[in-house]
Amino acid sequence: MDTVLGIYAHPDDADVDAGGTLTRFAREGARVVVAVVTDGDAGGSDQDLHQRMGELRRGEQRRACEQLGVTELVFFDGYPDGMVTPSHALVRDIVALIRRVKPNLILTLSPEYNWSSIYANHPDHRAVGAVVTDAVYPAARNPFAFPELLDEGLDPHVVEEVWFQGGPSTNHVVELDQADIEAKVRAVREHVTQFDDLDRMESWIRQGTRDAGKPHGYAGGEEFFRWDTRG
């Protein structure tokens, strides 16, 4: 895989959901870019940190990316945490990002309801998944969608695959080795403002990767719904 773009709603989404996959791609030599739509300033439970939460979470995400070996991190501006909607403006911003980065593969959040998981049903997650879907097809590949982007040198681009997480079904598992799992754990532990008990969170992460990998004989895994946009 030449270029992988992860598009997520909040700091920590990439690491909790796909940290092992992102670090594996980076280790194998792919260009890996992570984009975060909000700064997560409505997250956490410490009211004393609220005024600084966005700044703190950006720093946590930078350090988490370092743990994964991801060297390119993009933060969007103007999209408040907890208030993301599938707007025309956000579609345009993601189309511009796709055309700039030119990924073969996008990792993102599912736009579907998943009644088995409270976390997966965060409205920002579903909104980002819906916008990525609309941006990938047809807008990013259509020269007549957002024609002003052509003036910025952002030519149409076809994303070959999108892998969604958090939805009600999966059809693809990425194998993780122990190094991938350890990098994911280190990345998640950088998000100190979000998890009151980091040891408990680490145990949950380790169990989740074991559960995803075990049916396939893997040390660990991460599950996705894989969408091939080429047909």
Regions found by a protein language model. Name each.
Residues M1-K102:
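Active-site rim/loop-helix segments in enzyme catalytic domains that contact anionic ligands
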Residues M1-L5, P86-G231:
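Metal-dependent de-N-acetylase/amidase catalytic core
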